Amino acid sequence: MIRLVFALRRKPGSSREEFQDYWLNKHAPIVASVSSDLDILRYVQTHTLTDPANAAAQNARGSMEPEYDGVAELWWASEAALTANLQNEAAQKAGAVLLEDEAKFIDLPNSPLWFAYEYPQINPSPEDVFAKVKSNIVRVFFPLRHQGQISE
């Protein structure tokens, strides 16, 4: 499987709470409505907590990227399936619908995205465990910056 990872920052002038509410309650249903046109197999939103633990984790690691307000992840069956799907007109229209809505609440120039393969290192069982507000499941993201002394 291949996935899109989209590290999101809210548009200036909106609070994190407003951003996350819109993303979950307005944008997510739009993604769901076009998911079959885009052949999306899975869509996950990870909402950043406003918690002192975030600052502590960042301070322990030195200079880090400014905090993101959340991370969106979308999965497709394969790179070939994704590439083929993006050639069809319905997928192109669906992508335009998503981009139009994203421009309403996401600071797009400051919200990087990339396609990636995942390599699970620890995989909980059962796999149908979902994080919910006030659950004991918390996900941690460490966007890594390439160090100049390490070759690509």
Can you say where each PLM-predicted feature lies in the sequence?
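Macromolecular interaction modules
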Residues: 1-152
